[in-house]
Swiss-Prot record:
The gene is MED11. This is Mediator of RNA polymerase II transcription subunit 11. GO terms for molecular function: transcription coregulator activity. It is found in: Nucleus. InterPro entries: Mediator_Med11.
């Protein structure tokens, strides 16, 4: 039963974060609307900017806490039957291979230029 309450608490925290992101978007919309006016209300802009910054910092802190928690409980093992990890490793290896080829071609060009001179 404690597991369910912990899971529900985590879900509620994520819902709160989602609501906070909605507030961030509303603050940004209010600022954009105010900036589109010929004469802007400086105090309103300052209040909205402060609220925006505070909300972003709060969301960042809460998401970091969620990530830390998930890092602690995760075993690090890929899901049985999942090939995501293997595919990602292959993609990264191919990117490293492409990068090595690019650098080798640059070295070859440099050598050719030095030999021409």
């Amino acid at each position: 039963m404690a597991t369910y309450s912990l899971a529900n608490e985590r879900l509620r925290a994520l819902e709160d974060i989602e609501r906070e992101i909605g507030a961030i978007l509303q603050n940004a919309g209010t600022v954009i609307l105010e900036l589109s006016k010929e004469k802007t209300n400086e105090r309103l802009l300052d209040r909205q900017a402060a609220a925006f910054t505070a909300s972003v910092q709060h969301v960042e802190a809460e998401l970091s806490a969620q990530i830390r928690y998930l890092t602690q409980v995760a075993t690090g093992q890929p899901h049985e039957g999942s090939s995501y990890s293997s595919r990602k490793d292959c993609q990264m290896a191919l990117k490293r291979l492409d990068y090595a080829r690019l650098k080798l071609s640059e070295v070859a060009r440099t050598c050719e230029q030095m030999l021409e001179n």
